[in-house]
Amino acid sequence: MVHLTGEEKSAVTALWGKVNVDEVGGEALGRLLVVYPWTQRFFESFGDLSTPDAVMNNPKVKAHGKKVLGAFSDGLTHLDNLKGTFAHLSELHCDKLHVDPENFRLLGNVLVCVLAHHFGKEFTPVVQAAYQKVVAGVANALAHKYH
C-alpha cells in the first residue's frame, strides 16, 4: 500500500496520462541494463547486449520494457493493493526467475530518472516525491514473495 496525499495522487495520475509507455518502458529497462550491467544476466535470451547502443536499440529490450511499464501502469490503478496486484509477478520473479529483489528498486529509480528526462520542468520535486513513493511501493510489492 502506498500512502499518497490527494495532491500526490493527482500529480501521479496527471503525469502518467502523458507517458508513452512504449518509449519510456524501453528506455527505462535499457538504462537499467546499461547502468547496472549485472542485471543483463536475466536477459541473456535477448541477443546482443554488448554495448549501450546495442541495449538501447534492442527490440526485445524495448518490448519487455513496454510489458514492464504496462504492469506498472496497472499498479497505479491499485495503489491500495499493490501486494495483491503484483503477487503473481512477485512469485514468478522469486521462484522461477530468481531475480534479486534489489533490482526492482533499481528499476524504479531508473524509471524516475527517465520520467524526469522526458518531462523536464513538469517533473517538479512534488511529482518526483510522489513517484518515489510509488516506485518504492511497487518494488516492495514485487519483493513480497521473497520475505
Swiss-Prot record:
Location of N6-acetyllysine modifications: 60, 83, 145
Keyword Ion transport: no
Keyword entries, A-Z: Acetylation, Heme, Iron, Metal-binding, Oxygen transport, Phosphoprotein, S-nitrosylation, Transport
Keyword set includes Ribonucleoprotein: no
One term under GO cellular component: hemoglobin complex
Residues recorded as bearing Phosphoserine in the entry: 45
CDD domains cross-referenced by the UniProt entry: Hb-beta-like
Modified positions (S-nitrosocysteine) in chain numbering: 94
Domain Globin span(s) in chain numbering: 3-147
A Pfam family recorded for this sequence: Globin
Entry-linked PROSITE patterns: GLOBIN (PS01033)
Biological processes, Gene Ontology terms: hydrogen peroxide catabolic process
Residues found modified as N-acetylvaline: 2
Binding-site list for heme b: 64, 93
A GO molecular function held by the record: metal ion binding
Tissue specificity field: Red blood cells.
Modified residues (Phosphothreonine): 13
Gene3D superfamilies, per database record: Globins
Assembly behavior: Heterotetramer of two alpha chains and two beta chains.
Family of the protein in this entry: Belongs to the globin family.
Role according to the record: Involved in oxygen transport from the lung to the various peripheral tissues.
Protein name in the entry: Hemoglobin subunit beta
Native source organism of the sequence: Callithrix jacchus (White-tufted-ear marmoset)
Gene that this sequence comes from: HBB
